[in-house]
């Protein structure tokens, strides 16, 4: 079954911009969103600013992607924790999010012999400690991209 997945850690706020978060943390994010930057119709506005560190490296299990992210962030846990708690006081916060697309035939597949098993993952004590220290939530988004049989 084709599987495309990635993980990211994000700080988010309706009041504090990603640039301000970067200044406070001293860490350059991989991606940012700006509140109101993806307006396609008057009703669609991102609800917050986001500062993200992302791992999209193919061929890694989710826990391996999360380890890559935390290897970058853990030296800054105290600053991330302080900022996350300030953001949470105004409705923002922190999240570690996992995004998985099952049956994603649009993604290039490795040869069957080379394809790693990407199913199954776990969070070790190191990850759980970081989530607890930073007050981050865990989000998991999973999508079945198989063609709808009724649409044929």
Descriptions of predicted regions:
Residues 1-152:
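Acidic (Asp/Glu-rich) sequence patches and key acidic residues
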